[in-house]
A protein has these predicted regions:
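Membrane-proximal helix-turn-helix segments that form the acceptor-binding/catalytic region
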Residues: 24, 72-79, 95, 99-103, ...
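Nucleotide-sugar donor phosphate/pyrophosphate-binding loop at the beta->alpha transition
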Residues: 65-69, 107, 117-139, 206-207
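Nucleotide-activated donor-binding/catalytic signature segment of Leloir-type glycosyltransferases, i.e.
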Residues: 227, 234-262, 269
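Conserved acidic donor-binding segment of nucleotide-sugar-dependent glycosyltransferases
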Residues: 313-325, 333-340
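A charged, aromatic-enriched C-terminal amphipathic alpha-helix characteristic of glycosyltransferases
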Residues: 340-373
Length: 379
């Protein structure tokens, strides 16, 4: 009989590329997988996946009310399900997973996409920070099994709580011909900007340097396309209006994962920027960093440890120490105007993608679950 795995998130399932990859790989490895998330009021229909998907409805949409309601609903849902193991994705679903795993006496795992308590939107709010830090201190030591996105975060969890987590990077599936993605743009999709354009894809949240990126576009001779939404959408739109960039900065909104690769491949430059506030940003290794590599486009990224380590090995990006307005515009213009540099970085992307890809990462992922259920074969 197949082992039944449950994974829990607080976001809508349609756009979660990492969880789609993880659940698909474990399903292909022979597990019976269910992914549980939230249902937003304007959520599109779920796509067909090789695993089960379940979306919880909530009255509250954000804030403390949402997290309390969602965790209660999640607890009672999980309590009624048959499962062999349970994996909490980030800190905001860890409590119900811990309680249900104790009640049901089943293995539990923690998938830490980031240092949750050190995110800018948490660390900048002392009351919220204290609540989540208490949850982290109580729960994480009780999750001896888990994985995260890079060695820096894994080392931090070991330093704080004595748990040694594996590293599963957010790299895309290696495709034989990424250029073919361009031909797969949906017929009904809005047209892309004409000529060379700069792309930001991902959450439009606090701490992503939009306060500097948007005004920097005044001095850059190319449009900026933003694919995504988040808690900084209204301030970002206000910045565009403030600087008169309505014809230069384009908001595309949310894009389904299957529709995103052709857009990424059509871009000329990618953007991976984070503010320094919060250790989570400093230790980050964003999905889009690898998405740009696989699309074969050079990018502008912050000179933080995880990005620096990869760039030192493959030189696929221009890194900035300080993501200020002048630094961003200078770096973007360098990529736009220095053809030799651009094509060197582009060629290096093609080499880097052969090493950083999901086919390599999923081997480690599957091994984690094999060890969980059959430890005698790995001792």
């Amino acid at each position: 009989m197949k082992k039944k795995l449950f994974f829990t998130v607080t976001n809508d399932l349609v756009y979660d590329q990492r969880m789609i990859r993880i659940c698909s790989s474990l399903s292909a490895a022979g597990y019976d997988v269910t992914l549980v998330g939230r249902r937003n009021s304007n959520a599109p229909p779920l796509g067909t996946q090789p695993f089960r998907q379940y979306r919880l409805r909530t009255w509250f949409r954000s804030g403390k009310g949402f997290y309390i309601e969602y965790n209660l609903r999640l607890f009672f849902l999980l309590l009624t399900q048959k499962m062999s193991a349970l994996c909490a994705i980030d800190l905001d679903t860890i409590l119900p997973c811990y309680l249900v795993s104790r009640i049901r006496r089943i293995p539990r795992l923690y998938d830490a996409h980031e240092l949750f308590c050190e995110m800018q939107e948490v660390v900048s709010r002392p009351g919220i920070y204290r609540i989540w830090k208490a949850v982290e201190r109580f729960c994480v030591p009780k999750f001896p099994n888990g994985y995260t996105v890079n060695d820096l975060i894994a080392d931090e969890f070991f330093r704080l709580y004595g748990v040694r987590y594996a590293v599963i990077r957010n790299a895309p599936v290696l495709r034989p011909d990424p250029a073919a993605d361009i031909a797969r743009l949906p017929i009904a999709a809005p047209p892309l900007p004409a000529g060379r354009f700069i792309l930001y894809q991902g959450a439009v949240n606090e701490g992503r340097c939009f306060e500097s990126l948007i005004p920097a576009m005044q001095a850059v001779d190319a449009p900026l396309l933003i694919c995504g939404e988040g808690n900084f959408m209204e301030p970002a739109r206000a910045l565009v209006r403030q600087y008169g960039l309505e014809n230069k900065v384009i908001f595309r909104g949310m894009v389904r994962p299957e529709d995103l690769p052709p857009i990424t491949r059509s871009a000329y430059i990618g953007i991976t920027l984070f503010d320094r506030q919060g250790t989570s940003n400093y230790y980050s290794l964003a999905n889009r960093f690898f998405d740009y590599i696989h699309a074969g486009i050079p990018q502008l990224a912050v000179n933080y440890p995880a990005y620096q380590e990869i760039n030192n090995s493959y030189r696929i990006a221009v890194l900035v120490d300080k993501p200020g307005i002048r630094e961003i515009s200078d770096a973007l213009n360098r990529l736009l105007n220095n053809t030799e540099l651009y094509h060197t970085l582009l060629a290096n992307c093609k080499q880097a993608r052969l090493y950083y890809n999901w086919q390599e990462e999923e081997k480690k992922l599957v091994r984690i679950y094999q060890q969980l259920f059959c430890p005698q074969f790995f001792n």
